[in-house]
């Protein structure tokens, strides 16, 4: 126990160790050569052991060479003076704490720095793509001794200590060393093991405030509401998805079917008692269902660690850790691996736009605005109560860019859906005049965010061929999906929010009124090929009072289900990749609720079975018929037959591939149409390959069971035409027999 009177005679360095304010404890602790050696002593070993009753220096345990460590009077410093040649490079300290508990460990202050100069330089430049292998907590062997290297970035800290269940959460035991002006702090602690809990105790240089922070680069965390990071061993998981990864590296995604099932893992399905399913349980159940339904990919709402269930994962605190709600990091690897083995891709919802203000996480990490902007006009998103990243800071960009690569490389994720891109690109996003700061040119474009996104896409596509990066971007920002070398942002695809809103608004209208809003169906084709669009019926459309997909539809129950089947027929035949949120595929009545399972019991009822069967058949048809996907992002893959029949609320068009085509006719009224004529490009016999009004889907079964033969009657710029029967609120797909 330290004695204040004795402390008055100590050097400033020793006092700073006692007061836990020293920036480099290696200057004081560990092994040091004496400035004036003698015949019996040329070396000093000094350790600081708060609460120690006694301590000894283990020189050679096998030969029982143990020397006493003498307490510096009135302090918890212990010292040994002797000849350095007697000591091994790494000696052990054996001591008893105030509770008489015996402790033995190697001296952490006898190890050389571990972070290399090149590593620190690349990080300062914002270009260390494997920085997650250095920063954080990493088990490693140094000089043959097992331990854990801890490292973090906190340039405005006066002192940082590693605290955990291995040192009684006492910041005096393991203060870290700062590496010059890099802002990086590190300490190798021998004997600490995977599974141990830890945090960083940080003292701010300006204010002297001391606080605990979880590890920004932590790869595992305690189950909420606890917030400690968990030391995680290097994974020995044996991946079995080599065939999938090889295929992904060479696939032409722009000419391939892409049908995405959007899933929230915590509420897709739960156990009998309402508990979460594990990653491994979800892997099998979800893969079986997705294969049955015919989706090509699963997109999961953010799986990175987050403290609040209500945020759905969008307020991330552990960017490098799969949430512990469903299991361990290797359990999540199993989830990905199993889906890949079943031929299913995985897209991860990723949130680089903002982060929460939780005191244990990134917010004011070292007591200053480190990851965020100091000025709230740049650094705060008031709508969401979150903070905005400072993309102009190299180390912040590196944190995010390396994180994107981390998921693609370490977890074999097939793509990232980047959340809230519009909020990143616009300095005045959701702000009134005077609440934002213009860029250097006086505009509202966030030039630093733009550069960040271009760099994100360049490195993701450059290092992981075939990986997708998809933007949720809700404005008219130009060239979102155009290559970075022509000035675009470089995304693979962009959500088509305009088409989605127009379509849902149109479908929500009573059919008798639809004729007056026909342009909501046709306008989207004016810009359909200006970007690589994805058509999203996402989670955002079935929450907060917007109603479920089935409840958006007008009419009685029969008409609601018919409208929904028609809507999905439109989705699967319109140019662009597809995305459908869970529950919509079987017409769940209620809005999505993250705290419980989907209403799977509805599949006991025919109408819900019918919608599910229609979606399943549309998925499989979409994957089997090249004209429905091969030119999804090309204007020559779509041709209107008739977009002008607003009076009857009917549209018809042709989808084309390199070798065949499909006719699509959609009737948006409950009135059957007989002998409805459409022009066709090729004479011959046509047959119905899909009818959303089929009895198998719960419809009235009106359609064209017999083959249809063209007539030499010119119609709508085509020399041949067909007379077809259109079912009420129904969609037809026809092909040459």
Swiss-Prot record:
SMART domains found in the cross-reference section: Aamy
GO CC terms: cytosol
GO molecular function, one term: cation binding
Pathway: Glycan biosynthesis; glycogen biosynthesis
Record Pfam families: Alpha-amylase, Alpha-amylase_C, CBM_48, GlgB_N
Alphabetical list of InterPro entries matching this protein: A-amylase/branching_C (IPR006048), Branching_enzy (IPR037439), GlgB (IPR006407), GlgB_N (IPR054169), GlgB_N_E_set_prok (IPR044143), Glyco_hydro_13_cat_dom (IPR006047), Glyco_hydro_13_N (IPR004193), Glyco_hydro_b (IPR013780)
Keyword Transferase assigned: yes
GO biological process: glycogen biosynthetic process
UniProt-annotated catalytic positions: 419 (nucleophile), 472 (proton donor)
Keyword terms: Carbohydrate metabolism, Glycogen biosynthesis, Glycogen metabolism, Glycosyltransferase, Transferase
EC number: 2.4.1.18
Catalysis: reaction(s): Transfers a segment of a (1->4)-alpha-D-glucan chain to a primary hydroxy group in a similar glucan chain
Amino-acid biosynthesis keyword on record: no
PANTHER family: 1,4-ALPHA-GLUCAN-BRANCHING ENZYME
Similarity-based family: Belongs to the glycosyl hydrolase 13 family. GlgB subfamily.
Subunit: Monomer.
Described purpose of this protein according to its UniProt entry: Catalyzes the formation of the alpha-1,6-glucosidic linkages in glycogen by scission of a 1,4-alpha-linked oligosaccharide from growing alpha-1,4-glucan chains and the subsequent attachment of the oligosaccharide to the alpha-1,6 position.
Name of the protein this chain belongs to: 1,4-alpha-glucan branching enzyme GlgB
Name of the gene encoding the protein in the UniProt record: glgB
